[in-house]
Amino acid sequence: MRLMLSLPVLVLVLAMVLEGPAPAQGTMDLDFTRHLKEFGNTMGDKAREVIDRIKQSDIPAKTRNWFSETFQKVKEKLKI
């Protein structure tokens, strides 16, 4: 029974895939692609700026020291 129901669905899906995209969806507006590329470049630049700021700040060192100190405190408490 399942096979009898799944075969027509499979044929329908295959026909839809082989038909291809609708004409309105087939062509992409070049202006849209240009805007999308500009957006990607802008986001990439902003991400690089944030990463550079994080690298130049002392937050990673402070975080590492805090974790080390906390880990040492936990080790000492568990030792007792």
From Swiss-Prot:
It is found in: Secreted. It comes from the Eukaryota. Keywords: Lipid transport, Secreted, Signal, Transport, VLDL. It holds the Pfam family ApoC-I. One of its GO terms (molecular function) is fatty acid binding. One of its GO terms (biological process) is negative regulation of very-low-density lipoprotein particle clearance. Transmembrane segments: none annotated. The keyword Secreted applies. GO terms for cellular component: endoplasmic reticulum; high-density lipoprotein particle; very-low-density lipoprotein particle. Residues 1-26 form the signal peptide. Belongs to the apolipoprotein C1 family. Inhibitor of lipoprotein binding to the low density lipoprotein (LDL) receptor, LDL receptor-related protein, and very low density lipoprotein (VLDL) receptor. Associates with high density lipoproteins (HDL) and the triacylglycerol-rich lipoproteins in the plasma and makes up about 10% of the protein of the VLDL and 2% of that of HDL. Appears to interfere directly with fatty acid uptake and is also the major plasma inhibitor of cholesteryl ester transfer protein (CETP). Binds free fatty acids and reduces their intracellular esterification. Apolipoprotein C-I is present in acidic (APOC1A) and basic (APOC1B) forms in P.paniscus, P.abelii and P.troglodytes and perhaps also in baboons and macaques. The two genes for ApoC-I arose through a duplication process that occurred after the divergence of New World monkeys from the human lineage. In human, the acidic form has become a pseudogene sometime between the divergence of bonobos and chimpanzees from the human lineage and the appearance of the Denisovans. Pseudogenization resulted when the codon for the penultimate amino acid in the signal sequence was changed to a stop codon. This is Apolipoprotein C-I. It comes from Otolemur garnettii. The lineage of its organism: Eukaryota, Metazoa, Chordata, Craniata, Vertebrata.
